[in-house]
Amino acid sequence: MAIVSKSKEKNKIIRPADFRTTLFNMPKIDLHRHLEGSLRLSTLAEIARQHGVDLPSLSLEELRPYVQVVDDPPDFLVFLAKFKLLRRFYSSREAVERIAYEAVADAAADNVRYLELRFSPVA
């Protein structure tokens, strides 16, 4: 299957292998990104070590299901439960600054040109 693009190059065919690259290269806007959900696993483990936050594991792959929706059923309460652990990492000004900086850097790496980043410290 090919996808027809209605761009400057009239009816250009985009092959499936190139489609992912095409989407990645498109400039994007993100109007609703949560800082709590933008925490890198490696940063999470490092902040835990620095601030003595207990984690179920320090292995990034073992930690992933505790903070990301991986194989869980699509359930809103399961989704919200991930934030309980994530909120423990916003424990200092330096930690919040680092997490915010990395969230913006990650968005830029995804070719996001406009980002609305939100944070609810007490929810």
Regions found by a protein language model. Give the residues of each.
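Metal-cofactor-binding active-site regions of metalloenzymes
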Residues: 2-123
